[in-house]
A protein has these predicted regions:
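Active-site histidine-anchored catalytic micro-motif
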Residues: 2-145
């Protein structure tokens, strides 16, 4: 199926891997932080004009800075994507990922997910969600819509 023939997504799985998009201040500077689903829902509720499909959320473990991405983590992502589609019935998957290695992960997943007939998108941000001027929410909700 070519990308131009995918119907609009109805049930999206959002997989959160960490990365800048969900980082928060820690004793050691910015670090991937859990609890991003609640922050995402809060932001969505504060923007009633945003129209997005139904979505579910899964926080990967461990959350990582994408500079620490590994082939083993790509396998975890593959398993999470396949589970979202085959077990949970999602018709698309959005992966929230750090920008340092996003392109490498996209390339790896393009091979690891051969034959999977749903769109898989990756997005990230240059600044954490909630930071003034951040591109996080526009990138996330632009990809989700």
């Amino acid at each position: 199926m070519s990308s131009s023939t995918y119907p609009a997504a109805q049930h999206v799985m959002v997989l959160y891997t960490g990365g800048t998009i969900g980082m928060q201040a820690s004793a050691n500077g910015l670090a991937p932080a859990s609890g991003f689903e609640a922050r995402m829902r809060d932001h969505l509720h504060s923007q009633p004009e945003l129209v997005v499909p139904q979505w579910r959320f899964r926080e990967m473990s461990p959350l990582i800075d994408s500079a620490n991405m590994t082939p083993a983590y790509w396998q975890q992502l593959r398993e999470a994507v396949v589970d979202a589609v085959d077990v949970q019935g999602c018709d698309s998957v959005l992966i929230l990922h750090g920008t340092d290695t996003l392109a490498y992960s996209a390339a790896a997943l393009s091979f690891l997910l051969l034959g999977l007939d749903v769109p898989v998108l990756l997005t990230g941000s240059m600044q954490p969600a909630g930071v003034p001027g951040s591109d996080a929410w526009p990138n996330l909700f632009g990809a989700l819509a």
